[in-house]
Amino acid sequence: MSECCQHDHSHEREELPRTRHAGPVRLTFKVQGLDCAEEVSTLRRAVGPLVGGEDKLAFDVLNGRMMVLDGAANAGVEPIREAVARTGMSAVEWRPGTDGSGETERRRRLQAWFTAVSGALVLAGVAIHVWLAGSLSEAWRLFAGHGSAGMPWPELAAYALATAVGLRFVLPRAWSAAKRMQPDMHLLMTVAVFGAIGIDEWFEAATVAFLFALSLALENWSVARARRAISGLLNLAPTNARIKATDGTEREVPASEVPVGAHFIVRPGERLPLDGRVLAGASSVNQAPITGESIPVTKQPGSEVFAGTINGDGALEVESTKAAEDTTLARVIKMVEQAHAKRAPSEQWVEKFARIYTPAAIALALLIFVVPPLVFGAAWSDWFYRALVLLVIACPCALVISTPVSIVSALAAAARSGVLIKGGLFVELPARLKAIALDKTGTLSRGEPVVQRVLPLNRHTEEELLERAAALEARSTHPLARAVANAAATRGISAHSAAEVEIQQGKGVTGVFRGERFWLGSHRYLEERGQETPEVHERAEAFEREGQTVVAIGNDRHVCGLLTIADTVRPEARSAVKALRDAGIAHVVMLTGDNRTTAETIATQAGITEVKSELLPEDKVVAVGKLVERYGSVAMVGDGVNDAPAMARATLGIAMGAAGSDAAIETADIALMTDDLLKLPWLVHHSRRTLAVIRQNITFALSVKAAFVVLTFAGVATLWGAIAADVGASLLVVTNALRLLSPAWGSELSEDASVKN
């Protein structure tokens, strides 16, 4: 059988290298103060020379981690920590199992407290001003900007304290940036604050210090919010398991201590603590936390179950098949956490833009300060103030925070829906797809073919045909071989494996059974053997026109008979293909090792017009390569194991039904945890929604900056107004990014994010 044999032996071929993924990690550091892309850029410049280049570093802003990749120069832990310390941040070596979240949370709470105190002192200063002036209308003079003076000492003291408290976490970083001669937003804000103090604008200095501290607190909150969306997955699995001892007694132990092979009990309504196989009992299990399926799945003895899923109304006895740290849920969480280290193109663009934008804004501020007074004789104080406003505008807070939060939110939302995306790059790729190649068996079809007809010839019986076929296929694990074995078992036929079995790669199999040599193979193999009669040819053609796979069985004298085997198309296949086309992906191609007639029948049922059939494993790689050359951005959808070489050749590799399959999760760029083909158009729309949010945020943040540059030249903008606008922009872009976490918004398959291919 062409397809049978090709799948049986594809694992013997060497997989193509997957260069899109980050390399293995040598060292990981927990970095205090790593919150956004600007810190990433700072750390790359500081640590990159020690490890052999900036490309030897990867960053996980979500968890505040810096990774040194394999292949990096051996700099040692202490030199790296010292380099990080020179940036004003701190680093400690991190290992799996350690938890640095306590220190991070303590720092976040302390920073929030200082911010609140700074804000309270600013309000106190305003209250003192109003009280001493005796009129609320006098408060407006504070907000009028440059020109206010004559401040009484209690009010000045309140603003001075507000400034000092607001700069508590800013000054150390600003001093480090100044020493390195690499200005960052902390240095810009510090210069702006002290510049305002220099011209006796204490209210503006205090307001800028407070609002910048507020923007940093907002940044921490948004990252923590996205982090909680990921860590919430971890809480799905119970910490304890109810173990059943050999004497029948039950006791609770930590799930992390349960060995593989142990038996545990799951009562109705409880979550499963570990992956396993059902030994006794029957129940319906809600697998939505893993696969995103909304309908519970029936489980009975022999069924596979996953940690974090919810048991229905029946008790189950389960044998543990994986340790707690190796469950499907644990692997999903680990993959999602690591995914953010693989930066999306938009994240890389923002980081590069910030490197150019901030120095350019500083240069413009210097020109504004110097040129008008020198060339046109303008007042130095007025243009110095405007230069300070430009320094505030140069802070890229809203710009650098928006994209990472959007990417992390998209990763978390996808994981909740049963779609494991393994990097920011792969969040954006589905939006740009021009073509999708789908494997037939197990992807478009259920992958569980059954024997439809048994046609004996030349005086052989149906039982003899099934017995010989089962003997020849006894050692094969291919779905067609299982269909033969199931058909034989259904009729009560048991057969020992044939002797001297020889695989005819891509064609069939031969072997000796009951002292006689038999062969089994595809219609093409039958033709090559030269044993096909007109009658056999006519019948085989008729079966193939019905979309069935023909398997011939014979000996050295004649054809003993034919078996027809058919797979069934998934019920949602046609609607999924239509949804992909409606999304603008016009080229949907089916790849299969089946004969052309059978392949076209299946394709017609699925609504696919372009078919490539009778492909050997290496042919699929070539076919995908041609699609990439023709269309550019191409996804290959398969099982993640047999199709791994073809998936590696595609722009994007997507594995179907990856729940419980370690190989599929490892090899694919994106793993669909269930077999629902409708997840494909959902993925495309989700990617487009994410890109739309990122573009909206970048456009809005830059528009606010541009507007304030114009207002500054016009002499209308104030320091407090510029920083307030930046904080407001940060709040809006973060809120917009966090919309991606909304289940209601993310579930609207038909929503178009207006990002076209």
Where are these regions (language model features)?
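Membrane-embedded alpha-helical bundles of multi-pass transporters
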Residues: 135-151, 173-174, 179, 191-199, ...
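Conserved catalytic phosphorylation-site environment of P-type ATPases
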Residues: 186-190, 226-227, 239-240, 290, ...
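Flexible metal-binding regulatory segments at protein termini and peripheral loops
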Residues: 1-151, 232, 247-252, 330, ...
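Bilayer-spanning, highly hydrophobic alpha-helical transmembrane segments
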Residues: 112-123, 348-377, 386, 390-396, ...
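Conserved cytosolic catalytic loops of P-type ATPases
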Residues: 54-60, 65-69, 78, 232-326, ...
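Cytosolic catalytic headpiece
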Residues: 1, 48, 247, 424-642, ...
